[in-house]
Each structure stands twice: as structure tokens, then as C-alpha cells.
Amino acid sequence: MKKIILAAAVVAAFTGSHAYAEDAAPAAKPDNETSFNAAVVSDYRYRGISQTRLQPALQGGFDYTNNPTGFYAGTWLSTIKWTKDAGGSGDIEWDLYAGKRGQVSEAVSYDAGVLAYVYPSNGLDNVTGFVDANTVEIYGQLGYGPAYVKYSHAVTNLFGFVDSKHSGYLDIGANIDAGEGYTVNLHAGHQEVKHNDAASYTDWKVGVTKDFGVVTGALAVIGTNAGKTAYASPANGKFLGKTALQLMVSKTF
């Protein structure tokens, strides 16, 4: 349930008949930008929990940004298994989101928006112990250099949990440029499921991303302290929040 946004820096080199070298000048961004992204991942983890029963997923999306205002919107899809495993149906997660990002100051950035997680024909509202899996969250984020803190608040029930409206997720992390196309990814988060302490937990990730030019590769170790009863797969009993290695290959067009 986590959309992929791979940011690209646009740089233009100035050339001419000068007998001396000049610094490259960054090109002005166009008013409107669009991009597509696609990925294959060894295990789709969202907030530390496997959405695919510890198996691979195919993912892709589209993003639009209006640079003068900072407004953006997009959509993203992934294959999943958890809704069907829980007794419902469907094998797709479809996310729709919109928001606004910008700078509070030269050093501090912000991002605020709304995100809808749609699970077409999930049918969990017909399964005892669940409600409709479709979820809407509003979120706000502040960034300082490579570090950020983000809070997401559910304005509906959360991912099929009964009476879970107003659940919240706190996300703290940093994406540190290590040079040569490498980025170190650090994350810690806490999911509070309203009225359900057994389903609340903390997750973490330590990873590295490498831009190979043609594609981007990411390798991460992901884990949680989630309850094994609350997050065991109904299909085979496997714990969906166990510590594991995740590999992703992605491409932005």
C-alpha cells in the first residue's frame, strides 16, 4: 500500500563556442510534468506487513505534478493476496492520491494530501470479523534535508479492521545520498489500529537504493514487532510481519 514515487533531477549542460569551460546550468522545470513507473518486487511490504503472502508482486503507476503550485495527483496499482486470503476476493490494490508539496523555507519542505486505497470487489464486508477493506487517509509530512517525519490519519475504517476509523501511522525516516548513485534508506514507523491493541505494532527498514540508469534497484531488510496472531496469513499460517530481505527493480518513464 505504499505508492512508488521515483524523483528525477533535470539538468541541462550549456555548450557554446567559448574557449573556456562554464558550469552546467540547471534547466527550468516545465509547468506540468507527468511520469509512469513500473516495478517488480520480491515481497510487497506495506508498513512492514506483507500484502502478497511473502511472495512477489507487479506494480505500476502514473504521476502528474504542476510545478508552479506544487499540486500533484496520481494513481498506483499492485497485485496482492491478502483480501482473498482473508475470505474475500480480488487480487488488486488501486491507490488514488492528490496533494500539495513545497518549501516552508530553504531547508524545510512540506507535503500534505489525501490517499485512497481501493480494493475492487474485495467483499470483506461479507466476511465475519471484517469490514470493507477500502480505506482513505489524509497525511502531512515535513522534511529537513534527507530526513522526514510523516503522519497518516484514517478517516474511514482501516484495511478491513472493525471500528478502526481514526487509526494513525507515524513514519520517521531518512534517504541519504551516499554518492555514485547510491541512497541509504532508513525508516521506523508505528501503526496504531484504533480499538485494536493486538493489531497495533512498530515496523522498521534499513536499505540501499542504486540508480543504474536503465533501472533502479533496491535492497532492504524489513521487520516488525507485530503480533503473530493478528498478522498470520489465513491461507497458510505464515507470519506476514517477519524480518526478511526485500528486492525491488523499478523504472520511471
Tell where the protein language model's regions lie, with residue ranges:
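Cleavable N-terminal export/targeting peptides
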Residues: 1-33
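Short glycine/proline- and aromatic-enriched beta-strand/turn motifs that initiate or cap beta-hairpins
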Residues: 20-81
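Residues that define the transmembrane beta-barrel architecture of outer-membrane proteins
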Residues: 32, 54-58, 90-94, 132-138, ...
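Residues on the lipid-exposed face of transmembrane beta-strands in outer-membrane beta-barrel proteins
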Residues: 38-42, 60-66, 96-100, 114, ...
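Transmembrane beta-strands of outer-membrane beta-barrel pores
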Residues: 40-46, 66-68, 77-81, 102, ...
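Surface-exposed loop and membrane-interface regions of Gram-negative outer-membrane beta-barrel proteins
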Residues: 71-132
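Detector for outer-membrane/organellar transmembrane beta-barrel domains
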Residues: 126-195, 221
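Outer-membrane beta-barrel "beta-signal"
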Residues: 206, 210-215, 221, 239-253
